[in-house]
């Protein structure tokens, strides 16, 4: 036992040696990490007994030994130990490692925030030039004015006219339950406070107790979602971030922008109606491949958001009434207050209010005016609530706020009056914050985008033309479709009546348009058409909006995803802009969405990244030619394989001219928690997007040299060929993929409301991009990210050795190329082909082993060539912090990888025999009852007891360790 303790102590010492000298100053990561793990292991011993804790440490030690030498024998030893646990013990051990990875993530977040604060205190805004940190708004403004010699006024004008629209989507990549996310938040808070400078010994003791309590509560919560979420659940989960961080985070961030402006000599605040940050959502609006998003769901989600918005305003209005107790006001406000006072009943009492429930006297004019706002907010909230619960409401719509201008008007009146009476300082307090919230969130909190596949609209049009007996729309050429759609758009007659024969699918599409027509227009953002290829796709939606009587039609946004669609997108847009009717309809503004996930799945990361770059350049040229302002909407996932990566780098590496002060970008799944899970994270996210968008517009990145483009074009052809020859043309690839990864078991995690496939049968092309990336992330082989890079580098360097120098020059001088390479390098730092080899040996049929070996040799070759291009001796040598943090995690992730491989073996091969020892964990230390009660949480599993839960826990743990799922 003593020997074991020494071993554990020696691991801590090794971890300390891992830290390069440069890193160790004021670096508390290891301290935080060790504290959380100590507390957790104590809790584990208290709950499940000393034997179990020792087993967890033994497993960790074996894994750490493997990490030191990468000896495959150690993985086998680890496998033998893991398979000897009985069902209950397996679940507890897998859960322990998953839990420890979540704790490591929390320690890291607190440490990053701590280090950033320390630097800011010293007035150091610069950050290490690595991928995990970014510049803040103050530094960006100073850089533009002092280094780039821009005038402060020019910077201010650009800033107040730019817009970043963050679109929250329910992509099924958030694998941690909300119950756990909340507990994690409390652990984070305890940690932050424990390291505060002015903490007393008593505080420390109480915080330590709270920390242990939260760690235990998280460990005792079932990590596995037992039922899949509905779209309404996803919406509520997304909206909880507004409640917890975004609502208060926006005005706080805008105050920081005001301060930063003051420091470059601008003595004005950002106008409250400047659209710096906007929020949209796909939750309950994205019906692409998700049959569970029905018109009723869309209606519910909109009403729910309106109710939540009214509730948030309502909860703040009384504070504002308390604050504005002044009697001095301008004539305009006095007249309004007198009028309201006259019209209110003499002894009106409002017993449902806590404060200001009696009639407000006239010598408090601001309170009189705000009292009327409060009454209207109350009715607005109640109306949405009744409509949501009962489908009807007796409160008339005109007694509520129906548009934002109506809501802003009395608030602006108060603001003007305060300024006129010399009370600008008071006006710029809570009232300004409130005005900014109203301008940002409106009455609907977020604007809901609707997304639908273009084929579904084509089916509706086909039904209409057949019903009118003028032929089959589906069989018409693009020219004929456009001609007919335009003649209908210009004409006035209704296209169809109630006698149109409708399938369920057609009814669903038409009812969606009817819901859009029925609800207030400020509920909605864009109508996005996925798999859009031609102008008729856009015109069809315009016509359907008119037919269903949508008073303020939504802007229609084509989404281009596959490689071929991206190549033909500029031509399709030019054809659309050549239509006079359409140019008149859009008022000089168009939005185009580009998809990162499916383009990556279709051609591999290298070619997709380059094609996305070129498509944006060409789309902007088309828009400029027709005098249209184009907004690019980036559909990025969280993982590198789906376009993810650090925000500011992703923005700064976009082609010049393509952002131009307006940007829309999706924030998906687990990225929502990483961006908005905590107040400081929310602040940092808003800051990153705003600063990077401003910098990209005012200091555009350099355009690539013609010879760089030529080389990229050559390499993209090679990379696509290599990627497709394996993924689509290798006859047994799909079989290998399904055996070597947990793709077939992914659906059991219940993390999203939509199916994993667009169609139930079929190969890779029907699989959604998320499970495709998820499966490779789980085995730490990351094939979709790197496949193609190696072949491209090898062939161009073999052709001419000078190309290696050119690639190095591109890496050093061209932000887009550097970001692309750095992100793949980071993925290599997280990868381990040894784990993929173990999966092959256990799960893949022998005749496919050579194929697996061939892929692993490609992996090693790609890694070697990538390092040559970046002129690095080893992976991540330019980023010691990130390297250290990844190495702290490796042993935990490896344990879960081995657990997963052996559990899959037992699930898939009923003849696989293991020697199981007697149970060692107790249900709790006080009883001698074994922990196998955990097995009863999943009574309907079709596998041997405990296997399915163990598998899901390993998937969740690995996702936490890799810090992404799909």
Curated annotation (Swiss-Prot):
Modified residues (Phosphoserine): 10
Main location: cytoplasm
Regulation: By light-reversible phosphorylation.
GO cellular component: apoplast; chloroplast; cytosol
Keywords in alphabetical order: Allosteric enzyme, Carbon dioxide fixation, Cytoplasm, Lyase, Magnesium, Phosphoprotein, Photosynthesis
List of catalytic residues: 171, 601
Subcellular location as annotated: Cytoplasm
Required cofactor(s): Mg(2+)
GO MF: phosphoenolpyruvate carboxylase activity
EC number(s) recorded for this UniProt protein: 4.1.1.31
Any Gene Ontology biological process: leaf development
Keyword Phosphoprotein: yes
Keyword Magnesium in annotation: yes
Reaction it catalyzes: oxaloacetate + phosphate = phosphoenolpyruvate + hydrogencarbonate
InterPro entries: PEP_COase, PEP_COase_bac/pln-type, PEP_COase_Lys_AS, PEPCASE_His_AS, Pyrv/PenolPyrv_kinase-like_dom
Family matches, as NCBIfam families: PRK00009.1 (NF000584)
HAMAP family: PEPcase_type1
Family affiliation: Belongs to the PEPCase type 1 family.
Function of the molecule: Through the carboxylation of phosphoenolpyruvate (PEP) it forms oxaloacetate, a four-carbon dicarboxylic acid source for the tricarboxylic acid cycle.
Subunit structure as annotated in this protein's UniProt entry: Homotetramer.
Protein known as: Phosphoenolpyruvate carboxylase
Protein source organism: Medicago sativa
Highest classification ranks of the organism: Eukaryota, Viridiplantae, Streptophyta, Embryophyta, Tracheophyta
């Amino acid at each position: 036992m003593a020997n074991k303790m020494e071993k554990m102590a020696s691991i801590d010492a090794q971890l300390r040696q891992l830290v390069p000298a440069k890193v160790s100053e004021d670096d508390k990561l290891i301290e935080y990490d060790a504290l959380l793990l100590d507390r957790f292991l104590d809790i584990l011993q208290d709950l499940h007994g000393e034997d179990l804790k020792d087993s967890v440490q033994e497993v960790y030690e074996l894994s750490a030994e493997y990490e030191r030498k990468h000896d495959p024998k150690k993985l086998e030893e680890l496998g033998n130990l893991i398979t000897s646990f009985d069902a209950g013990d397996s679940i507890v051990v897998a859960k322990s490692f998953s839990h420890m990875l979540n704790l490591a993530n929390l320690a890291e977040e607190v440490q990053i925030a701590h280090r950033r604060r320390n630097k800011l205190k010293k007035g150091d805004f610069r950050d290490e030039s690595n991928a995990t940190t970014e510049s803040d708004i103050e530094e960006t403004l100073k850089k533009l004015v002092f280094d780039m010699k821009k005038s402060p006024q020019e910077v201010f004008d650009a800033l107040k006219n730019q817009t970043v629209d963050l679109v929250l989507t329910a992509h099924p990549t958030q694998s941690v339950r909300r119950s756990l996310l909340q507990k994690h938040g409390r652990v984070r808070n305890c940690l932050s406070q424990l390291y505060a400078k002015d903490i007393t010994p008593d505080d420390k003791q109480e915080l330590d107790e709270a920390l242990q309590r939260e760690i235990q509560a998280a460990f005792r919560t079932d990590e596995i979602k037992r039922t899949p979420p509905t779209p309404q659940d996803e919406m509520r989960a997304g909206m909880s971030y507004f409640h917890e961080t975004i609502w208060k985070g926006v005005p706080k961030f805008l105050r920081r922008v005001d301060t930063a402006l003051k420091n470059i000599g601008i003595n004005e605040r950002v106008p409250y109606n400047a659209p710096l940050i906007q929020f949209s959502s796909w939750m309950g609006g994205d019906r692409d491949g998700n049959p569970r998003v029905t018109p009723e769901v869309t209606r519910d989600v909109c009403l729910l958001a309106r109710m939540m918005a009214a509730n948030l305003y309502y909860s703040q209005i009384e504070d504002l009434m308390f604050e504005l107790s002044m009697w001095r006001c301008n004539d305009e406000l006095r007249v309004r207050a007198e009028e309201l006072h006259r019209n209110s009943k003499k002894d009106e009492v409002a017993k449902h209010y806590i404060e200001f429930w009696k009639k407000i006297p006239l010598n408090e004019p601001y309170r009189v005016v705000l009292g009327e706002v409060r009454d209207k907010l109350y009715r607005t909230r109640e109306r949405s609530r009744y409509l949501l619960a009962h489908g009807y409401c007796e409160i008339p719509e005109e007694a509520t706020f129906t548009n934002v201008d109506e809501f802003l008007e009395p608030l602006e009146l108060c603001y003007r009056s305060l300024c006129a009476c010399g009370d600008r300082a008071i006006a710029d307090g809570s009232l300004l914050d409130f005005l900014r919230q109203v301008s940002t969130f409106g009455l609907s909190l977020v604007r809901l985008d609707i997304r639908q596949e273009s084929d579904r609209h084509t089916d509706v049009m086909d039904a209409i033309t057949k019903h009118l007996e003028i032929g089959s729309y589906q069989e018409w050429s693009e020219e004929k479709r456009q001609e007919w759609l335009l003649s209908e758009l210009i004409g006035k007659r209704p296209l169809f009546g109630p006698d149109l024969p409708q399938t369920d699918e057609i009814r669903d599409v038409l009812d969606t348009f009817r819901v859009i027509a029925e609800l207030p227009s400020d509920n909605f953002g864009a109508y996005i058409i996925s798999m859009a290829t031609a102008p008729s796709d856009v015109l069809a939606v315009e016509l359907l909006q008119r037919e269903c009587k949508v008073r303020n039609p939504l802007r229609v946004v084509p989404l281009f995803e596959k490689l071929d669609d991206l190549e033909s997108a500029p031509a399709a847009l030019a054809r659309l802009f050549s239509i006079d009717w359409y140019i008149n309809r859009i008022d000089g503004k168009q939005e185009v969405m580009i998809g990162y996930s499916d383009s990556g799945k279709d051609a591999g990361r290298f070619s997709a990244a380059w094609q996305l770059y070129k498509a944006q350049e060409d789309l902007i040229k088309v828009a400029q030619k027709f005098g249209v302002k184009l907004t690019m909407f980036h559909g990025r996932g969280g993982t590198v394989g789906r376009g993810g990566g650090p925000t500011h780098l992703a923005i700064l590496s976009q082609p010049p001219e393509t952002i131009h002060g307006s940007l829309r970008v999706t924030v998906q799944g687990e990225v929502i928690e990483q961006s908005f899970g905590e107040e400081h994270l929310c602040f940092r996210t808003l800051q990153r997007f705003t600063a990077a968008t401003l910098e990209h517009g005012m200091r555009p990145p350099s355009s690539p040299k013609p010879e760089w483009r030529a080389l990229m074009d050559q390499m993209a052809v090679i990379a696509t060929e290599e990627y497709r020859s394996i993924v689509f043309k290798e006859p047994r690839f799909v079989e290998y993929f399904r055996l070597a990864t947990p793709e077939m078991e992914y659906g059991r995690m219940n993390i999203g409301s939509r199916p994993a496939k667009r169609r139930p049968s079929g190969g890779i092309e029907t699989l959604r991009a998320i499970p495709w990336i998820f499966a490779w992330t789980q085995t730490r082989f990351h094939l979709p990210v790197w496949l193609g890079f190696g072949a491209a580098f090898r062939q161009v360097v073999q052709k001419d050795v000078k190309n290696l120098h050119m690639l190095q020059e591109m890496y050093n001088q061209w932000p887009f190329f550097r970001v692309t390479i750095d992100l793949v390098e980071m993925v290599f730092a997280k990868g381990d082909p040894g784990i993929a080899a173990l999966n092959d040996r256990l799960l893949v049929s022998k005749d496919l082993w050579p194929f697996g070996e061939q892929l692993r040799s490609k992996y090693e070759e790609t890694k070697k060539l990538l390092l040559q291009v970046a002129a690095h001796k080893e992976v991540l040598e330019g980023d010691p912090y990130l390297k250290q943090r990844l190495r702290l995690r490796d042993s935990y992730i490896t344990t879960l990888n081995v657990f997963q491989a052996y559990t899959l073996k037992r699930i898939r091969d009923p003849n696989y025999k293991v020697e199981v020892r007697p149970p060692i964990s107790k249900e709790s230390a006080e009883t001698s009852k074994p922990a196998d009660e955990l097995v009863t949480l999943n009574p309907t599993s079709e596998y041997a007891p405990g296997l399915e839960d163990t598998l899901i826990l390993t998937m969740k743990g690995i996702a936490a360790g890799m810090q992404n799922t799909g």
